[in-house]
Design a protein with these regions (language model features):
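Glycine-rich nucleophile elbow surrounding the catalytic serine of serine-hydrolase chemistry
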Residues: 306-316
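A domain-start/cap signature at the N-terminus of enzymes
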Residues: 184-235
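Short, surface-exposed "cap/lid" segments of acyl-processing enzymes
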Residues: 220, 225-259
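Alpha/beta-hydrolase fold nucleophile elbow
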Residues: 296-308
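The feature captures the conserved acid-bearing segment of alpha/beta-hydrolase catalytic domains
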Residues: 330-423
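N-terminal Sec-pathway targeting helices
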Residues: 1-17
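Alpha/beta-hydrolase active-site loop
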Residues: 275-295
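Conserved alpha/beta-hydrolase
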Residues: 262-274
Length: 437
């Protein structure tokens, strides 16, 4: 009896020991599997680690694997987006569901494709999307590319006088380049086109010498010469007379009308506003803009000229037109500048000279042969990077220099490409170079 009891006790003890050993083995095996999963996690093998955690019933470990794997896919997608592999990036972002901002990045892959199209609507939508993703360098580059393309598109629309569409783009572009200024001008032009006749400039009641001159109009501030037919190729010209804010001699207008520049809308200011140049030059551009709007055209680039003391408002207008209107002045014709460049307050200062150089305006100075780099105002313009050309005149007379320029095709040459010298039989051209050192 005792022997049988001892046998059973031994069997039970063996079973207990076996169970304990099995439990210890299971614990050790679980710990080993967990260590294996952690090692795999550290190595970036998230899928394999997830299988182990899932087998262990470790939901926290599974969640960690899912989060790390999603972040890895997310970062890989961003790298592909920045590298321009939009299809591959789209596939990765699509697999992430609602993780972080993948919905926006997924859209960005599609927006990039809009760069290949001329569709303004798609480009505008793309611009908004990339602006929302400004923290990514690839998106910042895309914003610049799309903005540049939209800006060019707006200029094309404005040239075709589709101002409502152009204004919509300028408004979207906000502070990009001169968009805000152009938006303001575009809206004013639309208002002018809708204005009643009594508020217009170019009406029959304002015709000047209608029996002898075609398409010339007058108002209190200026004379207007209007092309027979305006188009997107129409050029724009503003003239400032000499004197100290004196009434312009009509001879300059009449000489111009002997040989007017075809397809050029010209504004001849009746006074040069010497004592308030910014106000007067802005008024000149306002008049040009209104006349252009009534003709169904929009100016983005102009040529200006000034005789005698009027040369100084012409030169200053380069900066004013750019800063206040977003208009680039292609070239300035200075016709025997008055006071022999000696009145310092009339000259461009250094800051204005540098602004004019950045704009890229060319200056043609029709002067007597002894005038050049020996004038501080001219030297300053040249040494600050401006393209300045001295134009020697065979007929070196103060008044005749201007009359010849008006009547002998100089304006038409100036609003053109100026690829060849103008009237070389009476003019010589010498490009001035900056001082060495």
């Amino acid at each position: 009896m005792k022997r049988r009891t001892a046998i059973w006790i031994g069997i039970i003890a063996a079973l207990v020991l076996l169970g304990a050993v099995a439990q210890i083995f299971r614990i050790c095996r679980t710990d080993l599997r967990r260590e294996q999963a952690e090692a795999l996690l550290e190595a970036g093998a998230y899928a394999h680690a997830r299988e182990i955690y899932d087998g262990l019933g470790d939901t926290e470990g599974v969640a960690r694997c899912d989060a790390l794997q999603a972040e890895e896919v997310y970062q890989e997608g961003i790298q592909l987006l920045q590298a321009g592999d939009y299809d591959s990036a789209r596939q990765l972002f699509s697999s992430l569901g609602s993780y972080k901002d993948t919905a926006t990045l997924l859209a960005a892959c599609g927006w990039q494709e809009a760069l290949a199209f001329e569709d303004t609507g798609k480009l505008t939508e793309a611009l908004r999307g990339f602006q929302a993703l400004g923290q990514y360098s690839a998106c910042q580059e895309a914003v610049e590319q799309i903005s540049e393309r939209l800006f060019t598109r707006a200029e094309e629309l404005a040239a075709a006088f589709k101002l409502e569409e152009a204004c919509a783009i300028w408004e979207e572009l906000g502070s990009y380049e001169s968009s805000a200024l152009l938006l303001q001008r575009g809206r004013r032009a639309l208002d002018w086109t809708a204005a009643p006749e009594e508020q217009r400039l170019l009406i029959p009641a304002n015709r000047y010498l209608s029996k002898s001159l075609k398409n010339v109009y007058v108002c209190d501030q200026a004379y207007f010469v209007i092309p027979e037919e305006c188009s997107s190729e129409t050029r724009f010209f503003i003239y400032y007379p000499g004197g100290r804010d004196e009434e312009m001699s009509v001879d300059y207008l009449l000489y111009y009308m002997m040989n007017p520049s075809p397809n050029t809308l010209a504004v001849f200011m009746r006074k040069n506003g010497l004592d308030h140049m910014r106000e007067n030059t802005c008024q000149a551009i306002d008049l040009l803009d209104q006349a252009a709007a009534e003709c169904g055209v929009f100016a983005r680039e102009i040529v200006v000229a000034g005789s005698s003391l009027g040369a100084y408002p012409a030169m200053h207008s380069v900066v004013y037109a750019c800063e206040a209107y977003g208009i680039r002045t292609d070239c300035v014709l200075s016709l025997d500048a008055g006071s022999d460049w000696m009145e310092e307050e009339l000259l461009l200062d250094e800051a204005e000279c540098r602004k004019a150089a950045r704009i890229g305006t060319e200056f043609y100075l029709f002067e007597s042969p002894w005038v050049g780099m020996n004038r501080e105002g001219i030297r300053m313009m040249v040494n600050t990077g401006n393209r300045v050309t001295m134009v020697g005149c065979t007929f070196d007379d103060h008044v005749r220099i201007s009359l010849d320029a008006m009547g002998m095709g100089v304006v038409d040459w100036a609003v053109g490409d100026r690829a060849q010298p103008c009237n070389p039989e009476i003019y010589s051209f010498t490009r001035l170079e900056p001082d060495v050192g």
